[in-house]
Amino acid sequence: MTKTKNLKPGQTYETATGKIEYTLQSDMMFHYVMQKSKGALTGLVCALKGISPSEVKDIHVENPIDLNNAAKETIMDIKLTLNNNEIMNIELQTYPTNYWIFRSILYLCRAFDCIGSGDNYSDLKATTLYCITDQKLIPNAQPEFYAKYLLTNQANHKIYTEKFGINMLQLNYTDLATKADIANNLVYWANLFKATTWEDFKALAKDNPAIEEVGTMIFELNYDNQAKELLEGQRRYREQMATEYATGVIDAKKELQPIIDDLKEKSAKLENENARLQALRKEHGISDK
């Protein structure tokens, strides 16, 4: 990428102050800096899995992006192979959707299907989809900071397999983090994603070379004209999709509300009539039998 900087004299990551225009919650930013910083990616993987860095022998991003060719429609989840025997699919979901449950299952299945026709099933790798979000994606779910979902038997709750699952990191619920979540640095990472000013980010990155490296890359991309054009294009696309979604919901409510109100009115009348008839039956000694 041709670097066309829009910097003032002496302006660097170390001296940056104020609002970060494109943060780690930009999925294009997130994908790019994670594929560039093995140290940061290792730290995030360890936090999500609850393992130590010494357990990471090899980590390989299967779908790196090229900012020279990135488009607003590009899928921005990170698919990686850990220690050559496990697939991790990490995605940011920062816009509302009614279809995340179906989509997450589809993405998980696609990631799990890593063998060709005629290959041995033993070559399949353990696969987990990790969703990092600030949205309410599962209706009626109890608030939880880090939720883990597996296939289980409904009767005895025995786990079908631990090699196929979905984990959700809910950025809005850091106050519900467990001691294990804190020890595994999940709250630290959640705060990195939520950092919207350079002061907040640098305070978190202090004495952590891998995160300082990420901060430097975020700074550079925020002041690279070509990168900013891509990031802004993607943001507008996401916002447009979110607006169309919200508009569709509002329009549907407007269209259906008269029908809903009419049904409620009819239901109330039926309930009143039923109560009146029950009172008459009781008054005249008529039994239900």
At which residue positions do the language-model features occur?
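Generic structural signal for hydrophobic core residues of well-folded globular domains
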Residues: 33, 48, 172, 192-193, ...
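Extended serine/threonine-enriched, polar tracts that run as long, contiguous segments within proteins
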Residues: 158, 163-187, 193
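Generic amphipathic alpha-helical segments used as scaffolds and interaction surfaces in large
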Residues: 32, 176, 180, 201-205
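Accessory alpha/beta interaction modules
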Residues: 1-165, 175-177
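Non-catalytic, well-ordered alpha-helical scaffold segments
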Residues: 27, 39-42, 124-127, 166, ...
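Short intrinsically disordered coil segments
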Residues: 144-150, 182-189, 233-235
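Short, charged alpha-helical interaction segments and adjacent helix-coil junctions
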Residues: 2-18, 88-93, 187, 191-289
